């Protein structure tokens, strides 16, 4: 391979890259979202400045993605924390777990999604929508919601899916010193809502040292939604460079 061609490659291994080029379009992406109130002091310890908390809330989200351009079929879950940045409201992505190596690789390399490997599932059990996460062999999350009990306004569903996502991008140099340390923002685009519902929900978080979702305890369930949508991942943008701060 010519030297001039090396920088044109997307990632390694060159003969079989870990992921293809985007854009990444999701068809029939299915969400189970549960918003809950948690401990404010716990949130203050983990949400990085210059983001500001927008209440003492967390959104647990479970997403089944059966048809993703270039990445195939997989399931993902995690915690998102409502925040504000320069008066723009969005969500800080705290941690994410999924069962697809290309999606993990592209999320971490090409963007800043805090992704780790886990075993999430979203399924219907009798008349309940269930989201479950295992890390290794151990259960970490069980989320339940009544299956399509009440319709949710489609505009409200769109608003939930269209919120900006904030993430940290941290890469060390070969000397162990920070090489990249940035706050990133990305938004979903080309959103089509196919259906949306709400209803009663419950959420159990189990302590795990390497999947510490339970460090943000469930104090009160605020709301829940079940949304079917198509969308495209937007291009991430740097909104704050921590290494430029003196």
UniProtKB/Swiss-Prot annotation:
The active site is at 115 (schiff-base intermediate with acetoacetate). Catalyzes the conversion of acetoacetate to acetone and carbon dioxide. Its EC number is 4.1.1.4. The lineage of its organism: Bacteria, Bacillati, Bacillota, Clostridia, Eubacteriales. Keywords: Decarboxylase, Lyase, Schiff base. Transmembrane segments: none annotated. It catalyses: acetoacetate + H(+) = acetone + CO2. It comes from Clostridium beijerinckii (Clostridium MP). It is an enzyme of class 4 (lyase). Gene3D superfamilies: Acetoacetate decarboxylase-like. This is Acetoacetate decarboxylase. Belongs to the ADC family. HAMAP family: ADC (MF_00597). Coiled coil: none annotated. It holds the Pfam family ADC. GO terms for molecular function: acetoacetate decarboxylase activity.
């Amino acid at each position: 391979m010519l030297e001039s061609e090396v920088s044109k490659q997307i990632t390694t291994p060159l003969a079989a890259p870990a992921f293809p080029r985007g854009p990444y379009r999701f068809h029939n992406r299915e969400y189970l979202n549960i918003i809950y109130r948690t401990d404010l002091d716990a949130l203050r310890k983990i949400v990085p400045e210059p983001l500001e908390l927008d209440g003492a809330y967390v959104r647990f989200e479970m997403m089944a993605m059966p048809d993703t351009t270039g990445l195939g079929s997989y399931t993902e879950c995690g915690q998102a924390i409502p925040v504000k940045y320069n008066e723009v409201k969005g969500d800080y992505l705290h941690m994410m777990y999924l069962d697809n190596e290309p999606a993990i690789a592209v999320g971490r390399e090409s963007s800043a999604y805090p992704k780790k490997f886990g075993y999430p599932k979203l399924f219907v059990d009798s008349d309940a929508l269930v989201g479950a996460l295992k890390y290794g062999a151990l259960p970490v999350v069980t989320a339940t919601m009544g299956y399509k009990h009440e319709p949710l306004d489609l505009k409200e569903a769109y608003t939930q899916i269209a919120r900006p996502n904030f993430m940290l991008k941290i890469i060390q140099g070969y000397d162990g010193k920070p090489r990249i340390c940035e706050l990133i923002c990305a938004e979903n685009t080309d959103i089509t809502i196919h259906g949306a519902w709400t209803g009663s929900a419950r959420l159990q978080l189990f302590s795990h040292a390497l999947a510490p979702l339970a460090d943000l305890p469930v104090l009160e369930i605020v709301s829940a939604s079940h949304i079917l949508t198509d969308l495209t991942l937007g291009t991430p943008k740097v909104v704050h460079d921590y290494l430029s701060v003196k």
